[in-house]
């Protein structure tokens, strides 16, 4: 019997999962216990619940896996700040102390936190790290009913990747293609979330819900100025309009000038038809990109099944458009498509790919 504990934490949507011999036994999100929406803290309560539900002690666990690789994320941060210098100096000064104090030493930090669950837990070598998008892909493919599938993941950013394509076949999952930061469909959508006055990494569903009340009259402005979309759905974002790579905001003055208004202050300004039209426009662009990617993948790999995960896969309207296009015979979406599902995916990847 092999027991694996998967953990996601320290960005948003912390969670824990336990699988035993490849079977999902327990999975829980920390916010359900703390009542803090998108709780990013170490998932102590979720781990306690999972251990209790599985009727095991932490020391019984054979392997513990974190859903992403902190050193690669730190590499991205450093390379990004160097590439955009001198822009981003304030953001750099704010980020570095956190990384140098805690995040770079995540294995030791995890070990110290894990010991609080079980005084007998003393083996730091049980702790492993998965790739962020591999965790997403595994969370979508391995629980799916398919023996073989194309697996598309899209979110803000993992270590470097923002969009990946993998092929899953039985116990194997191989990433074939990647789009890298700063070019990100998830961050593009989050930029408009910010611009319309909603909270990033939280209010994207509100932007999606706002879209039906508007008309996509700004679609042309988006595709002509902000994003270059290729025939296969791959894309390139014009960083002249964004601050997210190095700044403390998602968009900048050039973005404001393009659409004729500053970002909405939700404490002072009500939503207007302008914001509804903006929402409709970015929603349509997102749907068209996802459909183009889906069509090109079906044509290239000719596999009838599609699995989806990553934060963008929480856009159920876009998922519905892919389904309506009848590109694939079958589509399976990981319900916990965001980072919470990464805890499950990391554990499943370690079990299946390690076999």
How would you describe each model-predicted region?
Residues 1-355:
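Short acidic/glycine-rich loops and adjacent helix/strand connectors
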